[in-house]
Regions:
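Bacterial N-terminal signal peptides
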Residues: 8-19
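N-terminal secretory signal peptides that target proteins for export/translocation
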Residues: 1-7
Length: 490
């Protein structure tokens, strides 16, 4: 119920916020007019006139749609990717798509360019309970529902702890079962995401790990069918949430496949006057289309602002620097003690996909950490037309490796220059005599600097960067190691 209370509170604030300042009921004229951010509103004998009624309802629906856009971001990322999986790659819902190169990952929100991804999007209503075989070895990942809430980690940060095993995932309405030899979990949603990374730096060993990932129905466990692995190579695709009316068309479709959870009931009620209702087709009127289209644009700008200008207390990593913790959720289920982390959730799921315990980077030497910046040392937005420099000090606090990646601030995918969009400590990069590394960013290679240390950007495009720590060590947690800001080269 705490989630319902939160949404109720948000809705109340929205609905009373027409004026620049708060307006009490007694301040409304019995007969007369007053200015608001949506124009002049008029009352006659305490009632809104016809023009005011129309304005108020339009604004109610518009404001609700903007907030619903933010609410739906994690769900719509999954729906979009599942659709691309089926239509662009000709993969079945129980097939894995293996994203091995940076070109394969060009449509993926804030992907890392270093390790292979292996992804599937099963529908448990269609298959019944599913078995997922995880091979022994260095893998990371797990399973989430379609709201991107973790069902369980697998691999090194999962219950198998890197030893491999069989995971049995039940759907929302499947009967309980606990067969011996399986890690058993239940998904709150019908559609799920099976997401894994092969972490072995040896390419042959990584391929063997990928081949060891299997999916099949529990009902066919005695004679399981072979798992198909599909390559996305050479196919253009996009995991970016749809824009405009397509966002709402996708939302209307997916909510008709999924159960409504308690925390979402209030938002579902807010969507009903906009023509989006479970159990009914989405046939919006011209008025609804206009409001939804505008709200999708404004909602995305809200998400972009929340993501790139983070105002979360404690998200800044080092005083005076512009590096923030990108995945700034207290818990993987997106809940804080007294509220759902609505803005933090919007920030992360606008930029990225997936949450797991391992991605929170809270255990010394294990998991990953995601540090982010969209600004240079002077606080200016990063521009693809400018040249920049970053010094990575020696002894980076990682048990495995670090990487720096550049992303397009509109698509949140790799800056698509046709060349590798990242550099990592695994690469053949030039180090300084003191062990530090100088990296360069810009539309052209820096004169007199090692090209191996340069990441290309696109003129006229904004970009942001993730600095990833794989297996963060104590020097990060005690902040004794400090990453400088990216500096513009003048």
């Amino acid at each position: 119920m705490k989630n319902v209370c939160l949404v109720t509170r948000i809705a109340t604030v929205i609905l009373i916020g027409f004026g620049g300042a708060s307006v009490d009921a007694q301040d409304l004229p019995t007969t007369g007019s007053f200015e608001t951010r949506i124009g002049r509103l008029e009352l006659e004998n305490g009632y809104p006139n016809a023009a005011t009624v129309e304005k108020v309802f339009d604004d109610i629906d518009y404001q609700r749609a903007c907030q619903a856009y933010l609410w739906a971001l994690p769900l719509m990322a999954m729906q979009q990717w599942q659709n691309e999986h089926l239509t662009k790659f000709d993969a079945g819902k129980c097939d894995y798509v293996d994203y091995l190169t940076f070109q394969d990952k060009l449509g993926l929100l804030t992907a890392n360019a270093t390790t292979p991804y292996i992804m599937a999007f099963p529908n448990l209503k269609e298959t019944g309970p599913l078995v997922f075989e995880i091979p022994a070895g260095p893998t990371a990942g797990g399973f989430t529902d379609f709201w991107q809430r973790p069902i369980t980690d697998s691999g090194q940060t999962g219950p198998d702890k890197g030893a491999g095993g069989k995971y049995l995932i039940l759907g929302p309405d499947d009967p309980d079962m606990k067969p011996e030899g399986y890690y058993v979990f239940r998904s709150p949603t019908v559609n799920i995401w099976s997401a894994h990374r092969a972490l072995d730096p040896d390419a042959a060993k990584a391929r063997a790990l990928i081949a060891g990932l299997k999916i099949y129905p529990y009902s066919k466990r005695e004679n399981p069918p072979a798992t198909r692995h599909v390559s996305p190579s050479g196919r253009k695709w996009s995991g970016t949430q749809p824009r405009g009316l397509a966002y709402w068309e996708g939302l209307a479709k997916i909510i008709n496949e999924e159960p409504v959870h308690e925390r979402d009931r209030m938002v579902m009620g807010m969507l009903q006057p906009l023509g989006i209702e479970k159990g009914k087709p989405f046939t919006p009127t011209a008025r609804q289309k206009k409001i939804l289209d505008e709200a999708a644009r404004t909602g995305e700008l809200m998400a972009r602002t929340i993501a790139y200008e983070k105002r979360f207390e404690g998200s800044s990593v080092w005083p005076g620097k512009h590096w923030d913790i990108s995945l700034f959720l207290k818990e993987t289920n997106q809940e804080a003690p007294h509220h759902t982390q609505f803005d933090e959730r919007s920030s992360w799921f606008y930029e990225a996909v997936g949450v797991s315990t391992g991605m929170m980077g809270r255990t010394v030497g294990f998991g990953q950490l995601y540090l982010e910046t969209a600004k240079d040392s002077e606080g200016n937005w990063l521009s693809g037309s400018q040249a920049y420099h970053l010094n990575v000090p020696k002894d980076a606090p990682v048990a495995q490796f670090w990487s720096v990646t550049v992303y397009d601030n509109e698509t949140r995918c790799f800056v698509d220059t046709g060349v590798q969009p990242d550099r990592s400590s695994r690469d053949d990069i030039v180090k300084n005599a003191d062990g530090s590394v100088d990296l360069y960013f810009g539309p052209s290679a820096p004169v007199g600097k090692p090209k191996s240390n340069w990441i290309q950007t696109l003129p006229g495009k904004g970009w942001f960067s993730y600095f990833r720590l794989y297996g963060p060590t104590q020097a990060y947690f005690d902040r004794s190691w400090v990453l400088p800001d990216i500096e513009r080269v003048k």
